[in-house]
Each structure stands twice: as C-alpha cells, then as structure tokens.
Amino acid sequence: MKKYMGIIVDAISRRQFKGEITVENGKIIRVEEKEHDNEQYILPGLVDAHVHIESSMTVPSVFARMAVAKGTVAVVSDPHEIANVMGEEGIEFMLEDSKKSPLKVYFGVPSCVPATPFESSGAVLDINAVDRLLAKDDLHYLSEMMNFPGVILEFPDVMAKLESARKHGKVIDGHAPGLRGADLQKYIGAGISTDHECFEYEEAREKIELGMKILIREGSSARNFETLYPLIDEYPDHVMLCTDDSHPDTLIYEGHIDKLIRRGQEKGLDIYNLIRTAVFNPVEHYGLNVGLLREGDPADFIIVDNLKSFNILSTFIDGECVYENGKVLFPLEKVPAKNVFNRNKISIDDVKLVPPAGAIQEQTTEKGIKKIRVIVANDGELVTGQELIVPKIENGNLVSDPERDILKMVVLSRYSDDPVRIGFIKNIGLEKGAIASSIAHDSHNIIAVGATDEDIVETVNRLIKNKGGIAVGTAENLLDLPLEVAGLMSTLEGEEVASRYHLLNEEARKLGTSLESPFMTLAFMSLLVIPELKLGDKGLFDVTKFEFVDLFADE
C-alpha cells in the first residue's frame, strides 16, 4: 500500500483540494481530503486519442518511454502504417512489442490497407482479414475510414468492413477532411463516430452538431489546435486531443498531450474542460481501462509542479511509477529488425522526363510549352493545392527550377522495380540538394524531392541501400537515418532517433527549406485520400476527381 499527497484535481466535480490517494494492487482504493504542505498537483494520466506510433520513427516500446515522460499513460493507436508494409504480421509485431512497456496501447484494425486501389502496397487487408482481426480482444476499434467516397457511394467492401465493426461491437473512427452537408450526414449515418481531420472551425462545429466527436490534432506537420481550440470550452463533451503523426523531436522537445494542456491554459481555456478532453472523453468513448482518479480505478495518474507550467514530475500506470525526476523507470528491451523492401537502385535516366509529343506547341503558352500540374504544399497542413505552371526544360528534360521554388518530385515502389513516377511541387523551398524518405503515406513507397536530378538519385539510392529510412543532402554529401523496422521505425532509443532526426531537419533547412517539418510534409505528398493533388507510385492523382491526371494540362 502506498500513499501520495498533493493538490488533487477532480475534473468530475470541477474542484481542487488538498488530499491523499491510497494505492494498492494497482488500484486507487481511497481518495480523501487531508491537510498537508505538499504543493504539487495530482491529476489523471493523459491519453492521446489517435496516434500512429510508427510516425515517431520508434517502435512501441521505445515510443512508450517518450510518452510517459510527458505524462501520457495511454494511447489509442492505428497500426495502419506498418500494416500497409507488412500486413497482419506488422500488426502482430506492434501488439507484441507494446507489451514490453507499461504504457497502455489500444490498437485498432486498419480499415484501408491499401488506402486506395491506385497505389502499390506491401499488403491487402480485405474484409476477411478485417473481420478476423476485429474478433480479437486486443484490437479495440475499426481505425479511420479514409475512403469516405466509398462510404458515401456505398462500395460493398467498405460497407462490409463497417458492418463487421458493428457486429463485433467495435467503435468506428473517421477520416473526412472537408466533408460537409448531405455527404457528411451519410458518412455519419454509416456509424462513423469521430474525425481528426478538421482544419476549419465551422466544419468541426457542423460535425459536432451532427453527433460526431472531434479530435483536435496537433502533430509535427498537421497542426489544427490554433484553429479549433475554442471547441474545447464550447463542446467539452465532444472533443478529444490527439497528435496523429508526431516525430521524435516533437515529442521530446515540444511535448505530447501535455503541451496542449499548457497551450489551452494560455488561451484562457477552462482547466477542467482541458482535462476532460485529454483524459475522460477518450476513456469513455473507446471504453479504455484507464483510471480517472476515482476510488476503484486503475492507479493511472501524474504529478505536476503546478497547473500552469504543467511540468511532469512523475507518471504512474497501474500503481507503478514509470517516470520520475527525469528518468524512465522501465528497461529498454532489444527489438529485432523486420522489413519488406525489394527495390534495386535507380539511375539518372530513371528520373528524366522528356515532354511527350505535342507538349511543346507554340500556341499553348508564351514559351511554347504546355503548362504542367504542380502540387502546392501548405506548411502545417496535409491538404495541397494545385497550379498550372510553365515548366523549366534543359536539354529536352523537365527539371527543377529552384529560383521559382518548383521542384521535381519522384515516387517509386519499394516493393518492385516498377517505373519511377515524376511530378512537380511548389513551396518545399530547397535551393540545392534533395530530401528522400521511405515514410510516404500510406503505402510507404519511396518519395524524394530535389533541386537537381543527380541529388534526387543519390538520396533515393541511399534509402535503397539502407532498405528504408530518410536522407538529405547533395550528391556529394548525404546524411541519413536508417529505419530498420519496415522502413518506418528505428530500434534505437528515442533520444538518439530525435537527435539524428533533428540534424537531418537542420540540414534540410541549410539547403533552403523553411518548412516546419520538411520530412513530415514530404511524407503526405503521396497520400491519395487527402485533397487536392498528390503523386503516387502509379502517377499523378487528383483526389477531388478521384482519378489519375496527366502532368501536362489541357487548358
């Protein structure tokens, strides 16, 4: 039996009092008021309501060490990334590795593997696989249904997966950026209960009014807290907090859900509403076995210095102290490498793009060249735009134009030696060099963007040599971070991954980019379910039209 004194924050009765909690056999057996001189605060542990652990570039047991240091006791996680690479074997790896740490990880069953039929993935989870996985007790919900056109148009395979979730009594998560009106009503009517993709305030309000729970996302690239935070006080019972995709440097240097508690208070939000969104709502919505600082609950709680600075002093899970005084108190176990990578190196000829016959015509533009469709990246958002722009041509080859910030981008399958697909992108900002990654949502093929063809080829070939990872630099000077688990995650300690990743980000900035998170932004430029224009391993894709389009536009 152990006792802990402090100022207890009771979010249910919306009060704070000096008291003591008594813990025995992993449970809180008593919460009582008691006078003492301890000025530290005791609160329920925090919950990330939607996260892809793979985006931390660390395996679950390593991610857990970063999370508990920020007061997180549980996460609701979609193993969608590794499932696209390794299928059910990848999901099983995540389940087993998560057992090496005390962090409570609630995995779901990925609903869209692959995300679309328009790209190459390492696996397919059809209705039979999804139904089999949903029957498992350690898989707790149907993960984000990204194929919202399939829901609205009632594609049989999509509807069968939703029906399977209902049959097994599992919650269904949503993914519907920008969906409004009648289509939204149909989407919600299919039993989909959440959305973490809102980037406009009115969109989020409409979804809440129709019965959805909104997860306010603040990750490394997609950052929606600034736009959506008023919802926390307006609809405290209908909002949760999540990171979705957060890189290791963000987790270590900025924080996890704890940073949103701090920012919310800076915005003048009610502390009890913040705790509700960060703890109570996800626990209740997903039915998590996570304590809420009540008698009889699991002893999952945190101790902080004060509510304003919200510095995490200690984290407890099931009554065990897992973090205290800057130290994680559980061991780091060895993790075996696992991967699927079948790609040979490419040559300079593979990334050359010669305009097809008819693309150069005097009547099309003032330069006599047809305009091309260019992806327009938006810093901090997953949604892209598109512009029609006259390309730069050298020696008959379409090339990057750093002066106008129009850069060549390539995507190539990691699963075969299929042809390299080529597009162009604006707002990356590289003046020289290239960046490349085998983290490329959602099928995790190889994606690269650069100022010259030579730089692109060298960074891509470094990834192929490493069988996955990220790389940045020029043809003469490259830095890399190998990711030996599925080309998505490292087995190194979180601090080391964060440090190396930080160095790669700094190198990218030296090459000219001003993006907040260049590798995270790059990773979403091949995600064919988020508008507007993206590049996959089978070609340029217009998400709004849900079809492939030619690089050269007919004006």
From Swiss-Prot:
InterPro entries per the UniProt record, alphabetical: Adenine_deam, Adenine_deam_C, Amidohydro-rel, Metal-dep_hydrolase_composite, Metal_Hydrolase
EC number annotated for this UniProt entry: 3.5.4.2
Domain of life: Archaea
A GO molecular function held by the record: adenine deaminase activity
GO biological process, one term: adenine catabolic process
Cofactor needs: Mn(2+)
Enzymatic reactions: adenine + H2O + H(+) = hypoxanthine + NH4(+)
SUPFAM superfamilies per the UniProt record, alphabetical: Composite domain of metallo-dependent hydrolases, Metallo-dependent hydrolases
UniProt entry keywords in alphabetical sequence: Hydrolase, Manganese
Listed CDD domains: AdeC
Entry-linked HAMAP family: Adenine_deamin
Family: Belongs to the metallo-dependent hydrolases superfamily. Adenine deaminase family.
Protein name: Adenine deaminase
Organism: Methanosarcina mazei (strain ATCC BAA-159 / DSM 3647 / Goe1 / Go1 / JCM 11833 / OCM 88) (Methanosarcina frisia)
Organism lineage: Archaea, Methanobacteriati, Methanobacteriota, Stenosarchaea group, Methanomicrobia
